[in-house]
Amino acid sequence: MTNETKAVIFDFDMTLADSSYAIHHCSNLLARKFGLKEISREVVLAGIGLPIEDCWRLYWGDFKDEWLSYYRNEFRGVEQTGIRLFPNTVAVLEKLRGAGIKTGVVSNRRFASRVVESMNLTPYMDVIVGLEDVTNAKPDPEALFKAVGKLGVGAGEAVYVGDTDIDMQTAVAAVVRGVGMTTGNFDEEGLAAAGAWRVCSDLIEVPGLFGLK
């Protein structure tokens, strides 16, 4: 019920927004620039949720600071303009906040606040924690601990919503209920196996988990 849940914290990529096409496009622009193999959207989906260094090692077996610098300078803006919110993202955030539930983002993106701002979601967020704010990436619970602490709620009063096994493992490690979303690369079975408390196929289902209609 709503009085048992005081905060709902979200992953960003493939949870609040579909970034897969934008990342796919920009990753292949980078590949062409540096003579790397082009990758499929399926490969991109497999990497979403990882820090960018690990994503690129998955894509190309390597990571170079030169690539990252070029990507940030030339393609990060292009990527952000290609990201699209899922259809019910804003409505769900409004419903949760209207019921007095705090909302936030915890992401393995560096400077997650920038992409949240670019999607005009900042007014809906009480806290945003990106990779630059912590020492350890998810599934280490550090970022989720930080968000819960900033929100001033207990772990048992918080929920973390995400689309990957990493997100669910993070929730388990933080002793927070994890809601898995099948909008990314994982199905219901995979998310449940990773520790999901509940699994949803659309964000519109999330408020109902807390008694909101």
What are these regions (language model features)?
Residues 2-91, 95-99:
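N-terminal helical cap/lid subdomain that shapes the substrate entry/recognition surface
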Residues 37, 122-126, 154, 197-200:
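Conserved H-loop
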Residues 5-7, 139-168:
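Conserved Lys-Pro-Asp/Glu-containing loop-to-beta segment of HAD-superfamily phosphomonoesterases
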Residues 89-117:
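Substrate-recognition element of Asp-dependent hydrolases with the DxDx(T/V) motif
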Residues 159-198:
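Acidic, Mg2+-coordinating phosphoryl-transfer loop and its flanking beta/alpha structural elements
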Residues 42-43, 122-137:
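A short, structured active-site edge motif that brings together acidic residues
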Residues 90-98, 148, 168-173:
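Surface-exposed amphipathic alpha-helices with a cationic face
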Residues 2-3, 97-101, 151-157, 210-213:
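Glycine-rich phosphate-binding loop signature in dinucleotide/nucleotide-binding domains
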